[in-house]
């Protein structure tokens, strides 16, 4: 599943390419799974809207929309709803990529891939296409979408300590709790815990303030490095231009079960914590 760095990379690419463009028409596929909001509501909220900007909120891509677009084009065959000009402002198109979702900017003559669930035709002639083979991704509209938890790159150390201090769950599980930190997943939790020298099974309450401080810094460092390298391309992840990231080449423990630790040469271990895999070095992490 794309995590914070991958979603940030995609959102930045989309903002660079489509901010200021106008959504003229929207086509939605027949599969109901990707639609978290009713199809007609999505179409009516998007058509004739100008894309004010694209940003990341947690693991979601948020298209901020505003009025003032040109009249919508005639609906395509299969379109789920009629063209309409929304009267309210501040609408948002929310995209969660799920496990295999991709949000691509394509020329209109590009072949439409199998598993394409949404196409937004833009005034510039290009198309925004949502492709998701496994259909765990979600499309919705909102007017005030916010992340459930704190943003890892925005929260300060004192607030971070307050969020985690005293919890009885394993630290790996706490890092994956989107109501605490929004956007961190398996990859970056494992990599951050390694850099902080903390084992994933440790109960949060057992961590000292110094250890929480190291973890806070490690999370920020790992996420910033991953964003700079375009994220980790594992399985299907590509950015909005169809390009892969390269942070997977920098992974120190994630996905390296049985391989020697890059620091001490001890074989990396994999354990399951609350149904989720965790990778760690039994010597470097305490």
Name every feature range the model reports, one short phrase each.
Residues 1-77, 81-135, 154, 209, ...:
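Gly/Gly-Pro- and Ser/Thr-rich, intrinsically disordered tail segments characteristic of DNA damage-repair
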Residues 23-45, 55, 60, 67-68, ...:
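Basic, nucleic-acid-binding surfaces and adjacent catalytic neighborhoods in DNA/RNA-processing proteins
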Residues 89-195, 203:
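Phosphate/anion-contacting hairpin/loop surfaces
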Residues 2-5, 149, 200:
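Proline-rich low-complexity regions
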